């Protein structure tokens, strides 16, 4: 199984990324070290995580140990939409800061983190305008080669359809919560039809025991002599979806990477497809945002 997807602009993106939410200091450094050693070449961060510089510093020190350059890894960061009227100025400032933090001349992928700014409510009528201005600012930075690909996160079909009125560059990625108990079939099919890579975050439901102890997946994991986590990640990628798996445990990161080469049988894949409970396990509720 190929280890990369091709985005709509031809850019290659590794199927599995190491997520860095809540990772800082020695924990972040050590898990990045282990991840690089077993083959990870994609790392996911965000302005909101406040760890871009720590990730950049870790990569600067660690990449030479593995005979790698900064261009050999795919880096995603995410930025919330801006409230107010100066989105281009703020986006330019933030992207330049991210480039400095991460030691890059360009960013591989930047996502609009959520369909509203941090400082507005879900039902604020201005959210659509803030999304528009922030997206157009991101398009400008892609045109200026500061960013190779741009996309969204936590966007529903309505949010993407709304973009048709003003975009000149379609989103390359939509990153949302996705796992066997929350399969988002309609959104996933919409993204596939529109050549938007559907990328999962929180694929293990933030460690949700109902998900990880699901008897069907436990049996499949036992058959493959692996963990339920590896089965879930393999199922996601085998369904032609990208995935971000967050951990600060190096051994767990190494175990998760085995999913890149694990192949489920057609029957196993179908059995997991039947486990949808339409149940989100994290607090993000993009579908509630106007």
Where are these regions (language model features)?
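Acidic (Asp/Glu)-rich catalytic clusters
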Residues: 7-8, 56-70, 99-104, 164-167, ...
């Amino acid at each position: 199984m190929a280890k990369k997807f091709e985005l709509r602009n031809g850019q290659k993106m590794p199927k599995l990324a190491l997520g860095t939410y809540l990772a800082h200091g020695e924990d972040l450094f050590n898990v990045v070290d282990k991840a690089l050693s077993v083959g990870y070449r994609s790392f996911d961060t965000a302005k909101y995580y406040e760890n871009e510089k720590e990730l950049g510093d870790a990569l600067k020190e660690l990449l030479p140990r593995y005979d790698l350059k900064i261009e050999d890894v795919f880096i995603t960061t995410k930025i919330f939409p801006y409230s107010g009227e100066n989105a281009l100025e703020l986006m330019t400032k933030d992207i330049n800061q991210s480039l400095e933090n991460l030691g890059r001349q360009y960013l591989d992928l930047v996502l609009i983190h959520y369909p509203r700014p941090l400082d507005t409510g879900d039902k604020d009528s201005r959210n659509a305008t803030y999304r528009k201005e922030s997206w157009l600012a991101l398009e400008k930075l892609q045109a200026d080669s500061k960013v190779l690909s741009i996309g969204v996160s936590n966007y529903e079909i309505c949010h993407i359809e709304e973009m048709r009125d003003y975009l000149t560059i379609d989103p390359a990625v939509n990153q949302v919560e996705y796992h066997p108990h929350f399969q988002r079939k309609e959104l996933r099919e919409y993204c596939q039809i529109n050549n938007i890579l559907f990328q999962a975050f929180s694929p293990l439901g933030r460690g949700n025991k109902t998900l990880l102890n699901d008897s069907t997946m436990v049996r499949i994991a036992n058959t493959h002599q692996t963990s339920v986590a590896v089965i879930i990640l393999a199922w996601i990628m085998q369904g032609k979806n990208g995935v971000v798996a967050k951990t600060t445990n190096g051994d767990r990161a190494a175990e998760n990477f085995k999913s890149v080469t694990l192949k489920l049988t057609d029957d196993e894949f179908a059995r997991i497809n039947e486990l949808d409970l339409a149940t989100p396990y994290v607090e993000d509720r993009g579908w509630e945002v106007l």
